C-alpha cells in the first residue's frame, strides 16, 4: 500500500503535554500554513483541559446545558458533531499534506487502523462500525457497542487538520452531558475501563505515534478499504 502523504520526509512528532484548545487550534492553523508553504508534516500529541468541541452539524439538543455544566463549548471548523476532550484522553492532530488524488475517506481509515492496532497491542479488540466514524468496542450480552476513540478531520488546501481522540483514563461522566458525536444509542468507554487496569496517556503515546506514521506511509495494511470520495470532513 502506498503512502498517502505527498512528501517522503519524516513526520515531525511533537509531544506537548496539556494545551488549551484555542492555543492548539491556532498552532494547527500555523502548521498547516507552513506545510502548504513547503514545511514538514507534523503530528501533535497532547491533552486538553476539559472542553466540549462542536462540529458544524451539532444540533441544539446535543449540547450540554450551560446552567448545569461549567465546561466551555468551542465551535470548531471541523465536520461532525459535539465531543469532549479532557485529562486522560490522548488527542492527536496530524497536519499532513495529502497526495493526489485526494482521498479523505482513505486518510480517515488509516487513522482508524492505527488506533485499532494500538488497542490490539494492549489486549483490546476494537473495530469500525458501518456508518459511524471512530473506533468501537463491539457490543455483547445486551451491552451496546462503546466508542473508545473519536475521529474528526478537516482538509483544506490538501492539508489535514484536527484528528483523533483516544480515551485512555478519562472522566467518562463528562460525555453524559452531551450526545457524543450525535449518537444516542451507544456508549462511550476508555482503555482503562475495558481492560480493568490503568492505561495512562503516557502508556500509549509512543505506540500511537509509530502506528499513525506506519498507517499514513502504507506500512500498516488496512482491514477495510474505501473507494475514493470527495469527503472533506468527518467525525
From Swiss-Prot:
It catalyses: octanoyl-[ACP] + L-lysyl-[protein] = N(6)-octanoyl-L-lysyl-[protein] + holo-[ACP] + H(+). It is an enzyme of class 2 (transferase). Its main location: cytoplasm. The active site is at residue 181. The record marks 147 as: Lowers pKa of active site Cys. Its EC number is 2.3.1.181. GO terms for molecular function: lipoyl(octanoyl) transferase activity. PROSITE patterns: BPL_LPL_CATALYTIC (PS51733), LIPB (PS01313). CDD domains: LipB (cd16444). It is found in: Cytoplasm. Pathway: Protein modification; protein lipoylation via endogenous pathway; protein N(6)-(lipoyl)lysine from octanoyl-[acyl-carrier-protein]: step 1/2. InterPro entries: aa-tRNA-synth_II/BPL/LPL, BPL_LPL_catalytic, Octanoyltransferase, Octanoyltransferase_CS. Keywords: Acyltransferase, Cytoplasm, Transferase. The keyword Transferase applies. GO terms for biological process: protein modification process. Substrate binds at residues 78-85, 150-152, 163-165. One of its GO terms (cellular component) is cytoplasm. Residues 37-220 form the BPL/LPL catalytic domain. Belongs to the LipB family. In the reaction, the free carboxyl group of octanoic acid is attached via an amide linkage to the epsilon-amino group of a specific lysine residue of lipoyl domains of lipoate-dependent enzymes. Catalyzes the transfer of endogenously produced octanoic acid from octanoyl-acyl-carrier-protein onto the lipoyl domains of lipoate-dependent enzymes. Lipoyl-ACP can also act as a substrate although octanoyl-ACP is likely to be the physiological substrate. This is Octanoyltransferase. It comes from Mycobacterium leprae (strain TN). The lineage of its organism: Bacteria, Bacillati, Actinomycetota, Actinomycetes, Mycobacteriales. The gene is lipB.
